[in-house]
C-alpha cells in the first residue's frame, strides 16, 4: 500500500472557501497543489531543471493552462473527441498567470521551469482564473525553486458603488468592473481589467482593495510552505566580474550616451550596434577566450543604466520629448475603398491600419467553453507582422502576445459598443500593426474607435489608449507618457490605459519592482488622463461621431416581426422554403423564436423582395378579400386554388361560373391563374372560395 501524507490548508476568501492540498497527487513533480475555490478545482504542477543549459541568456519559464471538458461534465466536440490546441481563453489565462510570477524569480536564474495548470472540476459560477493563480503561487512557494513569493490574487467587481471580492459569474453581469490584481505581501505586480468608463479614483481603489484582500491568501501559502518545509535549491546568482564591468563602462558608456541622443529609431539602433560591436571587439582582442554572452549581458545592463540615468536626471527622453509629451499624431478615417470601415492611426513610429467588417448574427463567434456556451458579436484581431519592426520572421497563426494585445484592445472598446437591439450586426475589427515602436495595442484601440465610426457603428463615444512608463531610482521617479519600445524594456512599470473623456474602459499594469506606492500610481493615472484627452481631441478632428449610414458595401439588416406560430411556414419542410428564399433573393435571413426576422443584403431591391415573399407566406387569409390564385388541383366537385404560399382553398363546382358547370376541366386547368374571393374559413382552417363572387359584377346576386 502506498502511503500518502496530505497537507491541507483551508481559508475563507470572500464568499468562497479556498482549499490548498499537496502530498497526494503528482508526487514526482517538484511541487503539486490541488487548489479549490468552491467546486472549481485545479491541479497545479511545477517542475524545474536542476542544471542550467550552458550558454543560455534568458529565463525559460513556460506556463501551460488547460481546461479539460470533463471538468464540466462534457465530451469534446469535433472528430477526435479530445482536447486540442489551447483556446484563446486558455492562452489569455496562461498569460495572466505568467505576468506576475515571472518577475519573482531572481535575476540571473536561467534554469528551465514549467508550470502546468489543469482545470479538473468547474462550478459554472466560479471562474478558474483566480484559483489557478493562487494554486500556482502555492506550488512555486513549496517547490524549493528560487522564488521570491508567495503571491496573492483577487478579482474585484463594482456594483452599486461597492467593491465585490471574487464576484460570481452572475454577479459580474451587473458589475461595472472586472479587475484582476496579483501581488506580493508589500507590492502590486499585475493588474488586468475591463470597466464601464469608471473614474481613475474608482479604478485605483479597486487595485488597492484587491491587494488588501489577498493578504489572507499570502498568509495561508506561507503556512503551507512552513508545513511542507522543502529545502530551497542551493543556487546563487553568478558573481559579476567587476573588472570586466569597469572595462565595458570605459569602452562603451560615452558612445552609448551619444547614440541615445539620436531620435530616429533605426538610426539609433544602428549606432548602438556600432558602439557595442566596437567594445566587444576590443575586449576579445585583449582576451580571445572571453565569454561573449557575459559581455553582451553587461553591455545591455550598461545601456539600461545610461537611458535610466538620463531620464532620472531630467534630461530629454530618447526621442527628445519631455516626460509628459505624446508623440506626433496623424489620424485618418476612411482610408480603404471597399472595406465597411477603416482608419490609419500613426503615433510617432507606431502605426495601425484598422478595418471594420459588418456581418449578420450568424457571423458572430460561437464559443463553447467549460463555463458554458456563449456568442461573441464583437471580435477584435491584432496582427503584428515582422516588417513592423524592420525584421524578417515567421508569418502564420497568432502568437500568445498577439492574442493578449488583441484582447486588451477589445476590452478598451467593448464598453462603448451598441447592444444587439441598437445595432443588429456582428462586428469584426482587424488591427494590422504596420509600424511599431511602443504601445501598438493602444494604437489599436484608437484605430478601432475611428474605424467603427467610419463604418457607421453607433458607439457611445470615442475611445483612446495610452501606454505609460515609470523609472524609479531610490525616492526619485519619473512617469513617462506614450513610452517607446526601449522605455518599456528599461523601465520599472508599464501600464496601458484605454478610456473615454469620462473614464477608464481598460487598465493593464505590469510592475517589475517593489516600492510603487498608491501615490505614484495616482500621479501616473492623472498624467495618463491628460495624454488620453489630447489624443481624443486629435481623433475627433478626423471624425467625431459615427457616420449617418453604413457603407454601401456592407449588408443592410432590415428587421420585421411575424407571428411566432408562422416561423415553421417560413422555414418550410426540411428548410426548403427559407433555402429557396435566400437563394432566389440573394439575401441572408435569420429567424428568432420570438418572431423577429432579420433580412441582410447589400441590395435594397433584394431585401424588399424577400420581405414581400415572407409577408405572403405569413399572411392570414381574410374573409371577403379577393386574391389572385393559381389552380393546383382539379377534382370532380371543384378545384383547389393556392391564394397565398402554403394556403390552398376549394372553389366548389357551383362557384366557378354563373351558369351550371357540368365538367370542371371545361372551365379550369392546372396552373391557370384566377381571381377568387374568400367566402369562409372554418374552424379546421379550411378555406371556401368563389370565382363567381370575385367576378366584376357587383349587381349579380350571390350564389346559393
UniProtKB/Swiss-Prot annotation:
Protein's cellular compartments: Cytoplasm
EC number(s) recorded for this UniProt protein: 2.7.7.8
CDD domains (alphabetical): KH-I_PNPase, RNase_PH_PNPase_1, RNase_PH_PNPase_2, S1_PNPase
Keyword terms: Cytoplasm, Magnesium, Metal-binding, Nucleotidyltransferase, RNA-binding, Transferase
Family to which the UniProt record says this protein belongs: Belongs to the polyribonucleotide nucleotidyltransferase family.
Protein name, entry field: Polyribonucleotide nucleotidyltransferase
Gene: pnp
Sequence ranges assigned to domain KH in this UniProt record: 555-614
Co-factor requirement: Mg(2+)
Gene Ontology biological process: mRNA catabolic process; RNA processing
Catalytic activity: RNA(n+1) + phosphate = RNA(n) + a ribonucleoside 5'-diphosphate
SMART domains membership: KH, S1
Domain S1 motif residues, every copy: 624-692
Gene Ontology cellular component list: cytosol
Main location class: cytoplasm
Subunit organization: Component of the RNA degradosome, which is a multiprotein complex involved in RNA processing and mRNA degradation.
Record: residues binding Mg(2+): 488, 494
PANTHER family in UniProt: POLYRIBONUCLEOTIDE NUCLEOTIDYLTRANSFERASE, POLYRIBONUCLEOTIDE NUCLEOTIDYLTRANSFERASE 1, MITOCHONDRIAL
One annotated GO molecular function: RNA binding
Enzyme class, first EC level, given as a word: transferase
UniProt cross-references to InterPro entries, sorted A to Z: ExoRNase_PH_dom1, ExoRNase_PH_dom2, ExoRNase_PH_dom2_sf, KH_dom, KH_dom_type_1, KH_dom_type_1_sf, NA-bd_OB-fold, PNPase
Known function: Involved in mRNA degradation. Catalyzes the phosphorolysis of single-stranded polyribonucleotides processively in the 3'- to 5'-direction.
Pfam families referenced in this protein's UniProt entry, alphabetically: KH_1 (PF00013), PNPase (PF03726), RNase_PH (PF01138), RNase_PH_C (PF03725), S1 (PF00575)
Amino acid at each position: 500500500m502506498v502511503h500518502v501524507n496530505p497537507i491541507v490548508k483551508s481559508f475563507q476568501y470572500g464568499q468562497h472557501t479556498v482549499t490548498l492540498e499537496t502530498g497526494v497527487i503528482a508526487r514526482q513533480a517538484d511541487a503539486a497543489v490541488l487548489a479549490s475555490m468552491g467546486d472549481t478545482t485545479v491541479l497545479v504542477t511545477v517542475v524545474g531543471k536542476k542544471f542550467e543549459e550552458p550558454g543560455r541568456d534568458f529565463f525559460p519559464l513556460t506556463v501551460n493552462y488547460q481546461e479539460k471538458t470533463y471538468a464540466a461534465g462534457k465530451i469534446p466536440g469535433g472528430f477526435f473527441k479530445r482536447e486540442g490546441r489551447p483556446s484563446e481563453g486558455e492562452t489569455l489565462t496562461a498569460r495572466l498567470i505568467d505576468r506576475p510570477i515571472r518577475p519573482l524569480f531572481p535575476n540571473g536564474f536561467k534554469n528551465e521551469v514549467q508550470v502546468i495548470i489543469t482545470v479538473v472540476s468547474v462550478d459554472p459560477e466560479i471562474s478558474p482564473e483566480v484559483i489557478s493563480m493562487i494554486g500556482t503561487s502555492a506550488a512555486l512557494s513549496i517547490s524549493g525553486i528560487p522564488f521570491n513569493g508567495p503571491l496573492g490574487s483577487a478579482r474585484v467587481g463594482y456594483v452599486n458603488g461597492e467593491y465585490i471580492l471574487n464576484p460570481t459569474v452572475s454577479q459580474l453581469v451587473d458589475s461595472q468592473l472586472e479587475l484582476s490584481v496579483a501581488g506580493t505581501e508589500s507590492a502590486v505586480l499585475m493588474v488586468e481589467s475591463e470597466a464601464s468608463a469608471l473614474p481613475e479614483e474608482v479604478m485605483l481603489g479597486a487595485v488597492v482593495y484587491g491587494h488588501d484582500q489577498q493578504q489572507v491568501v499570502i498568509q495561508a501559502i506561507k503556512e503551507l510552505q512552513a508545513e511542507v518545509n522543502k529545502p530551497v535549491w542551493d543556487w546563487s546568482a553568478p558573481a559579476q566580474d567587476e573588472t570586466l564591468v569597469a572595462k565595458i563602462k570605459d569602452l562603451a558608456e560615452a558612445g552609448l550616451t551619444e547614440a541615445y541622443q539620436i531620435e530616429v529609431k533605426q538610426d539609433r539602433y544602428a549606432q548602438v550596434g556600432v558602439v557595442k560591436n566596437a567594445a566587444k571587439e576590443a575586449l576579445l582582442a585583449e582576451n580571445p577566450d572571453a565569454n561573449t554572452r557575459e559581455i553582451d549581458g553587461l553591455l545591455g545592463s550598461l545601456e539600461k543604466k545610461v537611458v535610466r540615468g538620463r531620464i532620472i536626471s531630467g534630461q530629454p527622453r530618447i526621442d527628445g520629448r519631455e516626460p509628459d509629451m505624446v508623440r506626433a499624431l496623424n489620424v485618418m478615417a476612411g482610408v480603404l475603398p471597399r472595406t465597411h470601415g477603416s482608419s490609419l492611426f500613426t503615433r510617432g513610429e507606431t502605426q495601425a491600419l484598422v478595418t471594420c467588417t459588418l456581418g449578420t448574427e450568424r457571423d458572430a463567434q460561437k464559443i463553447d467553453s467549460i463555463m458554458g456556451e456563449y456568442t461573441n458579436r464583437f471580435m477584435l484581431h491584432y496582427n503584428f507582422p515582422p516588417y513592423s519592426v524592420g525584421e524578417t520572421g515567421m508569418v502564420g497563426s497568432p502568437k500568445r502576445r498577439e492574442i493578449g494585445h488583441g484582447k486588451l484592445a477589445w476590452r478598451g472598446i467593448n464598453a462603448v459598443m451598441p447592444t444587439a437591439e441598437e445595432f443588429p450586426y456582428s462586428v469584426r475589427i482587424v488591427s494590422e500593426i504596420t509600424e511599431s515602436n511602443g504601445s501598438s495595442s493602444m494604437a489599436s484601440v484608437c484605430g478601432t474607435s475611428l474605424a467603427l465610426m467610419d463604418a457607421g457603428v453607433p458607439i457611445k463615444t470615442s475611445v483612446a489608449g495610452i501606454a505609460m512608463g515609470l523609472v524609479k531610482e531610490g525616492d526619485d521617479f519619473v512617469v513617462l507618457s506614450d513610452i517607446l519600445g526601449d522605455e518599456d524594456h528599461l523601465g520599472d512599470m508599464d501600464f496601458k490605459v484605454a478610456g473615454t473623456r469620462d473614464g477608464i474602459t481598460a487598465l493593464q499594469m505590469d510592475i517589475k519592482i517593489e516600492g510603487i506606492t498608491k501615490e505614484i500610481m495616482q500621479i501616473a493615472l492623472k498624467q495618463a488622463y491628460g495624454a488620453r484627452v489630447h489624443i481624443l481631441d486629435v481623433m475627433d478632428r478626423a471624425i467625431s461621431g459615427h457616420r449617418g449610414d453604413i457603407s454601401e458595401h456592407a449588408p443592410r439588416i432590415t428587421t420585421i416581426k411575424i407571428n411566432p406560430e408562422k416561423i415553421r411556414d417560413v422555414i418550410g419542410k426540411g428548410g426548403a422554403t427559407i433555402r429557396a428564399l435566400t437563394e432566389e433573393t440573394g439575401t441572408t435571413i435569420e429567424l428568432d423564436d420570438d418572431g423577429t426576422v432579420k433580412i441582410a443584403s447589400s441590395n435594397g431591391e433584394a431585401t424588399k423582395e424577400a420581405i414581400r415573399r415572407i409577408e405572403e407566406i405569413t399572411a392570414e387569409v381574410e374573409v371577403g378579400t379577393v386574391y389572385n390564385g393559381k389552380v393546383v388541383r382539379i377534382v370532380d366537385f371543384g378545384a383547389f386554388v393556392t391564394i397565398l404560399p402554403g394556403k390552398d382553398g376549394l372553389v366548389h363546382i357551383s362557384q366557378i361560373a354563373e351558369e351550371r358547370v357540368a365538367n370542371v376541366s371545361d372551365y379550369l386547368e392546372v396552373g391557370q391563374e384566377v381571381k377568387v374571393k374568400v367566402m369562409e374559413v372554418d374552424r379546421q382552417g379550411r378555406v371556401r372560395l368563389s370565382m363567381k363572387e370575385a367576378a366584376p359584377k357587383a349587381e349579380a346576386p350571390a350564389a346559393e
